Amino acid sequence: MSAAEKKPASKAPAGKAPRDTMKSADKKRGKNRKETYSSYIYKVLKQVHPDTGISNQAMRILNSFVNDIFERIATEASKLAAYNKKSTISSREIQTAVRLILPGELAKHAVTEGTKSVTKYSSSAQ
């Protein structure tokens, strides 16, 4: 065979697996998991109203609400730590952020419950 009669080189790079086998490897990874507060919301609902259920849409709305409040508090606490030239967010920054974000009575109750929870956690950790 002369140089003019040789077959053109294949377009696929040597050493790489064909695409269809790579797709089957992706299938083995499993589902992408979404982390939500659904189980915790459900537990609180059952503590407050044992005979009441909740729809999927209502659960999605509450989950979105919790994520939103969490993000607001974390952002505000981060700003407070930066103002005070601290690299760590402590319970004090969280408490101040809650007071700044939540209105009136709601902030007072949130701070009280938060303090109670931190105290309970600290005493059980020892």
UniProtKB/Swiss-Prot annotation:
This is Histone H2B-alpha. There is a cross-link at K6, K7 (Glycyl lysine isopeptide (Lys-Gly) (interchain with G-Cter in SUMO)). Keywords: Acetylation, Chromosome, DNA-binding, Isopeptide bond, Nucleosome core, Nucleus, Phosphoprotein, Ubl conjugation. It comes from the Eukaryota. Gene3D superfamilies: Histone, subunit A (1.10.20.10). Monoubiquitinated by the rhp6/ubc2-bre1 complex to form H2BK123ub1. H2BK123ub1 gives a specific tag for epigenetic transcriptional activation and is also prerequisite for H3K4me and H3K79me formation. H2BK123ub1 also modulates the formation of double-strand breaks during meiosis and is a prerequisite for DNA-damage checkpoint activation. The nucleosome is a histone octamer containing two molecules each of H2A, H2B, H3 and H4 assembled in one H3-H4 heterotetramer and two H2A-H2B heterodimers. The octamer wraps approximately 147 bp of DNA. Interacts with rik1. Core component of nucleosome. Nucleosomes wrap and compact DNA into chromatin, limiting DNA accessibility to the cellular machineries which require DNA as a template. Histones thereby play a central role in transcription regulation, DNA repair, DNA replication and chromosomal stability. DNA accessibility is regulated via a complex set of post-translational modifications of histones, also called histone code, and nucleosome remodeling. The modification N6-acetyllysine is found at K6, K7, K11. There is a cross-link at K120 (Glycyl lysine isopeptide (Lys-Gly) (interchain with G-Cter in ubiquitin)). The keyword Acetylation applies. The keyword Nucleotide-binding does not apply. The modification Phosphoserine is found at S10. The lineage of its organism: Eukaryota, Fungi, Dikarya, Ascomycota, Taphrinomycotina. Pfam families: Histone. InterPro entries: Histone-fold, Histone_H2A/H2B/H3, Histone_H2B, HISTONE_H2B_site. Residues 17-27 have a biased composition (Basic and acidic residues).
